[in-house]
From Swiss-Prot:
One of its GO terms (biological process) is response to mannitol. It is found in: Cell membrane. SUPFAM superfamilies: L domain-like (SSF52058). LRR repeats lie at residues 110-133, 134-158, 159-181, 183-204, 207-231, 233-255, 257-279, 280-304, 305-328, 329-352, 354-375, 376-399, 400-423, 425-447, 448-472, 474-496, 497-524, 526-546, 596-621, 622-645, 646-669, 671-694. Induction: Induced by microbe-associated molecular patterns (MAMPs) such as LPS, HrpZ, flg22 and oomycete-(NPP1). Accumulates upon infection by the soil-borne necrotrophic pathogen F.oxysporum f. sp. lentis and associated with nitric oxide (NO) production; this induction is prevented by the plant growth promoting saprophytic fungus T.asperelloides. Induced by NaCl and mannitol. Residues 761-786 are cytoplasmic. The gene is RLP30. The keyword Transmembrane applies. Belongs to the RLP family. Residues 31-739 are extracellular. This is Receptor-like protein 30. Receptor for microbe-associated molecular patterns (MAMPs) that induces a BAK1-dependent basal immune response to necrotrophic fungi (e.g. S.sclerotiorum) in the presence of MAMPs (e.g. flg22 and SCLEROTINIA CULTURE FILTRATE ELICITOR1 (SCFE1) from the necrotrophic fungal pathogen S.sclerotiorum). Functionality seems to depend on the presence of the receptor kinase SOBIR1 as an adapter protein. Required for full non-host resistance to bacterial pathogens (e.g. P.syringae pv phaseolicola).
């Protein structure tokens, strides 16, 4: 009885098993048939593909799978509905489409599309109104293209949208009132466009589903809504770099879900008032920088315990830092620079990761807790441009992971302590400029291989440069100007592979610059200022023959000159981005460069005791913008090769003993706006170029045999010419480049030098040579511009 029942039960189980298995197979087969892409969908996608000029030899990887022989539901970037087989998602981000979207595009035949992502596709032109026909879209991403026009009217029809991403294009126009139809919108990013808006208060309160809002870098000139508490899902709020006005948006901070707020770069004003901020606030990143907020830092800010990043810089805040800031136990990054804050710097700040308090009126340091001085946290400390005084703060020596230290423009005195060696291993920037530090620059750089920038200028340092600087293999800028350092020229710095800026001006350096055992000079130097020292001797004709960085243009380094006018030395990107600064004589005036332009090339040897000829090899430095050799004892003729310096803006050869003529070809240098040839022994005619004829008379004064100055100085001050002088002016140019040929031969070989020398024995070949030499010296620079 029992065995019979057991067999019956087993049979039932087996039957049920095969029934379920069969059902699953049938369902799978049926489902697989439905997965097939519909023909109309495939044809629409292929039509869309053919609208873009994709090379047959190099088809786009993402579109290479798109062909008639395969199921379009398995094409890359395509997703179909499981049941209907219709395309519901198209993601072609980073595919180089290189065209515009046509009104009749096959794309707009995909009526069931829910997700359309065409970011970074090199799309351009206006977006057609046909976009509004894709009524089922919930996600639209056209970011990072070159699209133009007024797109928002069409987008406003897409009332199912949850994500709208249009950032980094050139869209324009006002946000239409119909935009309020997008009530399901959760993420809105229209940043970095040219949208306008004068009444944000009408639009924003209706978008109650928003969790992320980014309208940064547009042309909005509105106030914020007085009541934003209805945006109860909001986490991210970014209105940076617009022209928003009004008072502090108190209601915004009553939203419990809020995590990130960026109000930077607007025209908000008045005191900072948080109101009844939620006790459960999740706000961790608050940026109110670059506005017109005034009054004190509110004590109530200490109640936002979740804060990690706080930036109140570039406002009109006054008074001390509230002691209650110590309650912000999660705070890691604090920037209060460029305000009118004063008093004591709280010691609790030394436990943070980055502290920026520059350009205020702080005058003392508060007591620090032992935990704040453990040396494990701080990476960046900027106390520049305050009223801090006394000896070097020794507690800084305990900060073992410092990457950037700026104590510039304060009242510190005494010596720089040797214990600073403890903080140099990770150090990338050390700025002690414009204090009253005295004594020797300590030998603390043995382990400072990461140091990019050292500026100790405008102090009272003496002695010699520490030889441990030779270990700073990443050094780009060394500025010891305006001290009383007495040493010979640090020729050993030639071995630093990245040194671009060397400033030794206004010290007591002495001796020669030229050493026989150093054959190739500073290959990467872009700017050198050794003015107002005691250097002496002659400069070899080959002295500048291998200063390659002054020969190579930014265009050749990077393959493109896009944006190079906005690049500055020292700006390295997110890991380290601190601009280098300097002071030097520019266009006859002592000028403070808060940032050093990336393209700037300059040589200032003025105010020394050099004599002999100016090296002809200076004519190789075709990227040079400034050349100042004034106040020396150079003799003989002005090199004809200077006419090759087509980017030269400033030339000062005054107060030497130069003779002969001013080279006629200098008159063709169109950028040469500032020049000085005064107090020499020059003769002959002044070149006729526009830049020469627009100079002040003092540019040529005390050269008694110069003539052609009637338009510049007036007839009463213009000496007359003689036929003899006119004949002397037609001197042969083949003397000019013998030294250049020798310089080239000196490096690559005698044969190259002889060939180039032969070329330059033919008159008027300078530009041809520079073009060829320039091309042969082309380098690829892998470091990013900053």
């Amino acid at each position: 009885m029992i065995p019979s029942q057991s067999n019956s039960f087993s049979g039932s189980v087996i039957t049920l098993y095969f029934f379920l298995l069969g059902s699953l197979v049938l369902r799978t087969l049926a489902s697989s048939r439905l997965h097939y892409c519909r023909h109309d969908q495939r044809d629409a996608l292929l039509e869309f593909k053919h609208e873009f000029p994709v090379s047959e030899s190099k088809p786009s990887p993402s579109l290479s799978s798109w062909n008639k022989t395969s199921d379009c539901c398995f094409w890359e970037g395509v997703t179909c509905d499981d049941e209907s087989g219709e395309v519901v998602s198209l993601d072609l981000s980073y595919v180089l489409l290189n065209n515009s979207l046509k009104p009749t595009s096959g794309l707009f035949k995909l009526q069931q599309l829910q997700n359309l992502t065409l970011s970074d596709c090199h799309l351009y032109g206006e977006v057609t109104s046909s976009l509004g026909n894709l009524s089922r879209l919930t996600h639209l991403d056209l970011s990072s293209n070159q699209l133009t026009g007024e797109v928002l009217a069409s987008v406003s029809k897409l009332n199912q949208l949850r994500d709208l991403l249009l950032s980094e294009n050139s869209f324009s126009g006002n946000i239409p009132t119909s935009f309020t139809n997008l009530t399901k919108l959760s993420s809105l990013d229209i940043s970095s466009n040219q949208f306008t808006l004068e009444n944000f208060s009408f639009i924003l309160p209706n978008l109650t589903s928003l969790s992320s809002l980014n309208v940064a870098s547009n042309h909005f000139k509105s106030t914020l809504p007085s009541d934003m508490s209805g945006l109860h899902n909001l986490k991210y709020f970014d209105v940076r770099e617009n022209s928003f006005v009004g008072t502090f948006p108190t209601s915004l901070f009553t939203i419990p879900s809020l995590q990130i707020v960026y109000l930077e770069g607007n025209q908000f004003m008045g005191p900072i008032k948080f109101g009844n901020i939620s006790s459960s606030s999740r706000l961790w990143d608050l940026n109110l920088a670059d506005n017109k907020f005034d009054g004190p830092i509110p004590e109530y800010i200490s109640e936002i315990h979740s804060l990690i990043v706080l930036d109140l810089s570039h406002n009109n805040l006054v008074g001390p830092i509230p002691t209650s800031i110590s309650k912000l136990v999660n705070l890691q990054h604090l920037s209060l620079s460029n305000n009118t804050l004063e008093g004591e710097v709280p010691g609790c700040l030394w436990g943070l990761m980055t502290v920026t308090l520059s350009h205020n009126s702080f005058n003392s340091f508060g007591k620090s807790s032992s935990g704040a001085l453990d040396g494990e946290s701080m990476q960046e400390l900027d106390l520049g441009s305050n009223s801090l005084g006394g000896p070097f703060p020794h507690w800084i020596c305990k900060q073992r992971f410092l990457k950037y230290l700026d104590l510039s423009n304060n009242l510190f005195n005494g010596s720089i302590p040797p214990c600073l060696k403890n903080s140099t291993y990770w150090l990338k920037g050390l700025v002690l400029r414009n204090n009253s530090f005295s004594g020797f620059l300590p030998d603390v750089f043995v382990n400072a291989s990461m140091l990019l920038s050292l500026d100790v200028s405008y102090n009272r340092l003496e002695g010699k440069l520490p030889k441990s600087l030779i270990n700073c293999t990443g050094m780009e800028l060394l500025n010891v100007g305006s001290n009383i350092i007495k040493d010979t020229f640090p020729s050993w710095l030639v071995s630093l592979p990245s040194l671009r800026v060397l400033i030794l001006r206004s010290n007591a350096f002495y001796g020669s610059l030229y050493y026989d055992h150093i054959s190739f000079g500073f290959q990467h130097l872009r700017l050198i200022d050794i003015s107002q020292n005691g250097f002496s001797g002659t400069l070899s004709p080959l002295y500048f023959s291998n200063w390659r960085e002054m020969v190579t243009s930014v265009l050749e380094e990077n393959g493109s000159n896009i944006g190079t006018e906005d690049w500055y030395m020292g700006e390295k990107g997110p890991e380290f981005s601190h601009s280098n600064s300097m002071t030097m004589i520019y266009k006859g005036v002592e000028t403070d460069f808060l940032r050093i332009p990336y393209f700037f090339r300059a040589i200032d040897f003025s105010g020394n005791r050099f004599f002999g000829n100016i090296p002809e090899s200076v004519g190789l430095l075709k990227e040079l913008r400034l050349l100042n050799l004034s106040g020396n004892s150079f003799t003989s003729n002005i090199p004809q090769s200077l006419a090759n310096l087509t980017n030269l803006e400033t030339l000062d050869l005054s107060r030497n003993q130069l003779s002969g003529h001013i080279p006629r070809d200098l008159g063709s240098l169109s950028f040469l706006s500032t020049m000085n040839f005064s107090h020499n022994l020059l003769e002959g005619p002044v070149p006729l170029g526009t830049q020469f004829q627009s100079q002040h008379c003092s540019t040529f004064m005390d050269n008694l045999r110069l003539y052609g100055l009637e338009k510049i100085c007036g007839k009463a001050h213009a000496p007359s010419s003689t036929p003899l002088e006119s004949e002397e002016f037609s001197e042969p140019e083949e003397q000019v480049i013998n030294w250049i040929a020798a310089a080239i031969a000196y490096g690559p070989g005698v044969f190259c030098g002889l060939v180039i020398g032969h070329i330059f024995f033919t008159a008027h070949k300078h530009e041809w040579f520079m073009e060829k030499f320039h091309r042969n010296k082309r380098r690829v620079v892998t470091t990013s511009a900053r």
